[in-house]
Amino acid sequence: MRVLGDKIGSTLLAQTADVSTMPWNGDGLTANLDENGNIPEEQFDAACIHSEDEAVEAAERIGYPVMLKASEGGGGKGIRKALDEAELRTAYPQVLGEVPGSPVFLVKLCVGARHLEVQVVGDTHGNAIALGGRDCSTQRRFQKIFEEG
């Protein structure tokens, strides 16, 4: 569950399981979980952006527009849209400053998408049930205004 609670870790795990993901700086990487169910540090680190120049290289590879995101961000903090290199270079220090110490990654912006959330409960026997979903697409500055269930 710890891996699924992290934006980079969950994307890396989904990609490893052949689940479709948006193009991102970690395309093509795989994760081999350790005996505790965690992604080894070196594999996680390979999926992170470590410099402004690395962010620009990744954006040029996947194509603009992109979202630069702090893995530990939330509530509109640590997320910036960049339509071109100049915006990305401006966004990089802002994202780092809003969520100090957080790993950072970059993902292709999906225009016109909906933000849907589903609550799932599972037990130790492999049983799981979806409790329902909600549309959280109405946002202001990347922060949910209301959730429609």
Locations of regions flagged by a protein language model:
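N-terminal beta-alpha lobe that positions the nucleotide/phosphoryl donor
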Residues: M1-G149
